[in-house]
Each structure stands twice: as C-alpha cells, then as structure tokens.
Amino acid sequence: MTQFQGVKGTRDIFPDEISRWHYVEGVVHSVAALYGFSEIRTPVFEYTELFQRGIGATTDIVGKEMFTFLPDPNGRSLTLRPEMTAGVMRACLQKNLLSQAPVHKLWYISDLFRKERPQAGRQRQFTQFGAELLGVSNPAAVAEVLTLMMQVFETLGLHGLRLRINSLGDLDDRARYREALRAYFQPYEADLDELSKERLKKNPLRILDSKNPALQEMIMGAPRLYHSLKPESVAEFEQVLAYLDDRQIAYNVDHLLVRGLDYYCHTAFEVTSSELGAQDAIGGGGRYDGLARELGASADLPAVGFAVGMERLMIVMEKQGLFATLNPHGPLVSVIIQQKELAGHAMQVAFHLRKAGIKTEIDLAERSMKAQMRDANRMGSAYALFVGQSEFESGIYALKNLVTSEQTSLDLDAIIEVLREPAARESLRP
C-alpha cells in the first residue's frame, strides 16, 4: 500500500519547532494588547465574490491563486481565504460594529491559502499575523498600526529590516496615474511580457509590481504616482511621515511601491529583509477606506491594517540567530516508577503534581527504571521523583535534582512546595 504524503505546499510543525511559534505568537498577543487591539477570528472560507470584489478582479490573487471549490447548496462558490482583511471587514459590517462604537482595533493570527509555487517561506497554506484599525481617517491611525508592527519586530529582536512607504492617493489620484502609466508603457507594449501586457489593459499599476528583470529598467523610468497626487493627499502622507519621524522609525519613501491588492489607498507600506533573497517581503499593509463600500456598505469606512507572513518572519529570525537563546523547557519533574505494580499509585502522584501546576512527565509504557531515567534526561527534566514500595508505604518520596545530583526525601505536599519555589525552576534545562 502506498504511504500517504502531505499535500504539496503544506508542512507539518512538530513539537521541536512549535515552541518557536508559541514564542512569536505570544509576542504578537502581548504587543497588540499594549495598543488596545483585541483578537478576531473569522471563517476559513468565504463566498468567492467577497474576494473578487474586495481584493480586486485584476489581482494575481483573484486571477490565479485562489482555492475555489464547488458551490454550496445555494449555488454560490466558496473560496479558502487568501488574505484576512476582506473577511474581517465583512464580519464587522455584518455585525454592524461601527454602530456600537466608532473605532475598532482588531488583530489576528490565521492560516491562509494560495495556489503559489512552493518555495522557502512561500507555501500554499501559510500563516499571517496582522492588525486592522477601523473608523479613524486621521494619519495618526496609520502611524498607530505601523508602530505596532515595528514594535513586534523590535521585541522579537529583528534587525536590518527595511520599511518602504508610499502614498497611493485617492481614487481620482490613481485614475490620473493609471492614464499616465498607460501613456508611458503603450509605446513599449511589444517589449512587455504577457502578464504585463494583460496588466496594461486592466490595471497598469500592477506592472510596477513585476519582478521580471528584463522590465526593471523600463519600470524605473515610469512616472511616479507622487506627481499625480492632489495637495490634500500629499499633506496627509507628509503627516504620516512626521509621526514616524517623531517615533524614530526609519523608512524609505519608494514612489514605485503599489502593493498587490486593489483595495489600498493613500498610505501603503512594505517591510523587507535581505535575508530572504529576491522574494524579500516579510509583510506590509496600508489604508483601504473604499473596501467597506465595495462589500456593500453605504459609504466608505476609514480603515488601515497590515499583515506579516509568519513563515517568512521565522526564516529571518533563524538566520539572525534569534532562536538560539529560546529555551523550551522540558518537564520540571519526571515520576520514575520502580516497580510495575506501583504504576497506578505513581500516576496518582503525577496527577497531584499536575493539579498543583507542576509540569510532570510519567512513563506509560511500563519500561525499566534505566529507560525512564534515560528519557528524563533526554527531555531535560530538572528533577526525578521515585515511586517504589517504601515510598508507597511511607508516603515519603525521594526527589533527585538531575542537575546537581542532590537528593532529599519528603512527603508529597513538601515536594510540591519545593518544586513551586523559583529556585527549582533555575534547574530547568533546555
């Protein structure tokens, strides 16, 4: 019989790696709480038209990368979410949250799905963390989510990241810019690749996103969106930059940055790392005031957010040695069964230790004491608690420090007090 393999573009995360995920997730949770953001969770699939309207029909995500499957009983096709923002906005509009409070600050850590060519840091099922701030049009809202994102990176110890930022203006600004780009690229249409020719017809801003080396010189000569902005759009962008200056957040203004989703307006940004090679983006985001109207609201809703790829982030952390000091502890104590017939009593001892909040391991396979001790050392247990006939009869147990080899005999209540002491945890081993 053929052995099953995981689906291409997916990966398994085993216990020896999961501590890294827990660490990063914990930092995201704690920093988001500092800024007053609350967690939101949305369904893993939505109606396909949510993404077609929300992300944009001309984007690569909608055109080529969505996992869409058979219609539901009502005849509407469903899609595994390729990004979070459209689903979060749908949830907030459906719940009518903005009528309950004028501002909502939300964060998430969620799995997403795209039909991409699998490679390092780019999977078909992947995880992002992000934040969305709804209801504030002031440039301070952009600075707020940007600062939150950069504080997560700082707390994780990342260095050498580059923040690129640009203004995409409003609808009128972008309409003028699209015409300027068409006028610029049309004389070179024969030199464009097939994808860029298609983008020239549908949305020439997407050409600026091309990674084709043969087009980079042409792209560098393209008109800049900044020159199509009205004075109000320029003033708003400069205010965002002033907030970043006040907070000493370094950035590079990149007037060719457009991002890959059609819902962005005004400020857009991206964070990159040279550790990732050509596909160097860790995350990004921006304003998306028009998304609510696209999804059925009666008016625009000021909103700004970001998303960061967890797998890519963790590749950078690994390359920068940031997991070297992460010490996932083993059990505080391993209960060692000296005689098989005492296994039931030993399990009761382990039960009471765990009820007391003490991380405890016990052998369930009726192996020898030697094998149990070998496992205790392999797992990094700080202590071994021995259960034999004399311990069973007297209620006094031998407790051995596996780091110092010191041993003492105490009743279970006294052992619990010892193991609760901060000094006991100093013996924890990686």
Curated annotation (Swiss-Prot):
<dbReference type="Pfam" id="PF03129">
    <property type="entry name" value="HGTP_anticodon"/>
</dbReference>
<dbReference type="InterPro" id="IPR045864">
    <property type="entry name" value="aa-tRNA-synth_II/BPL/LPL"/>
</dbReference>
<dbReference type="InterPro" id="IPR015807">
    <property type="entry name" value="His-tRNA-ligase"/>
</dbReference>
<dbReference type="InterPro" id="IPR041715">
    <property type="entry name" value="HisRS-like_core"/>
</dbReference>
<dbReference type="InterPro" id="IPR006195">
    <property type="entry name" value="aa-tRNA-synth_II"/>
</dbReference>
<dbReference type="GO" id="GO:0005524">
    <property type="term" value="F:ATP binding"/>
</dbReference>
<dbReference type="InterPro" id="IPR036621">
    <property type="entry name" value="Anticodon-bd_dom_sf"/>
</dbReference>
<comment type="similarity">
    <text>Belongs to the class-II aminoacyl-tRNA synthetase family.</text>
</comment>
<dbReference type="GO" id="GO:0004821">
    <property type="term" value="F:histidine-tRNA ligase activity"/>
</dbReference>
<dbReference type="InterPro" id="IPR004154">
    <property type="entry name" value="Anticodon-bd"/>
</dbReference>
<keyword id="KW-0030">Aminoacyl-tRNA synthetase</keyword>
<keyword id="KW-0648">Protein biosynthesis</keyword>
<dbReference type="InterPro" id="IPR004516">
    <property type="entry name" value="HisRS/HisZ"/>
</dbReference>
<dbReference type="InterPro" id="IPR033656">
    <property type="entry name" value="HisRS_anticodon"/>
</dbReference>
<keyword id="KW-0067">ATP-binding</keyword>
<dbReference type="GO" id="GO:0005737">
    <property type="term" value="C:cytoplasm"/>
</dbReference>
<dbReference type="Pfam" id="PF13393">
    <property type="entry name" value="tRNA-synt_His"/>
</dbReference>
<dbReference type="GO" id="GO:0006427">
    <property type="term" value="P:histidyl-tRNA aminoacylation"/>
</dbReference>
<keyword id="KW-0436">Ligase</keyword>
<protein>
    <recommendedName>
        <fullName>Histidine--tRNA ligase</fullName>
        <ecNumber>6.1.1.21</ecNumber>
    </recommendedName>
</protein>
<comment type="subunit">
    <text>Homodimer.</text>
</comment>
<keyword id="KW-0963">Cytoplasm</keyword>
<keyword id="KW-0547">Nucleotide-binding</keyword>
